Amino acid sequence: MQRRALLGLAILAIGLGIAGCGSATSSAESPKPAGKSPSAISRMVCAEEAVAEIAEVVGAKAAVTAPTWADHLYSCGYRYTEGTMVLSVKELSSWPQTYAYFDELAKTLHKTAPVRGLGQGAFVVGDGSVVVRKDWKILLVDISGLHGMVGSPPSSRDTVALDAAAVILDCWNGD
């Protein structure tokens, strides 16, 4: 029941347009293949605007680690007193690659429930982390390093993951 409520919160957050992070590619543009450096879309997960939007929604400011880029994976950590949440974006170069990577994460991270209305496909995994597919990008909000409730008012780790994913997707959609 709690997971169903959390999934509803994610959908509500998207519907309310909680984030306003910069500009994103329009839905009319074709996906771009992975390049030598991270795309603007990927860099958004660690950008000041997204950090501020996530802090507002979660109710806690995070110290964000320096972003890394390796093997077409862009990531950074959001450090809270309760631990670290890692946001990462895997850039791929085709639909088949994207679907295969998404499906592999579902298997290796132990998908427990789909998330409707988030990206072009999304799911929650065993520890409450969230995976979202949007075009040729896969967002992972990894909360395995968070312990206990986060923010003010306090939110469960699952809620924090869904809220962070919703903020990033709103940034990507240009809302």
Language-model-derived ranges and their functions:
Residues 1-9:
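Bacterial N-terminal signal peptides that target proteins for export
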Residues 7, 17-33:
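Bacterial lipoprotein signal-peptidase II cleavage site
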Residues 12-13:
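Repetitive helical segments and hydrophobic/amphipathic motifs
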Residues 28-83, 169-172:
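Extracytoplasmic low-complexity, Pro/Thr/Ser/Ala/Gly-rich segments
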Residues 42, 48, 53, 85, ...:
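Subset-of-secretome marker
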Residues 56, 100, 104-107, 163, ...:
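Charged/polar, solvent-exposed surface patches and flexible loops
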Residues 61-117, 121, 125, 134:
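Short, solvent-exposed recognition patches
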Residues 113-175:
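A short, solvent-exposed beta-edge/loop patch
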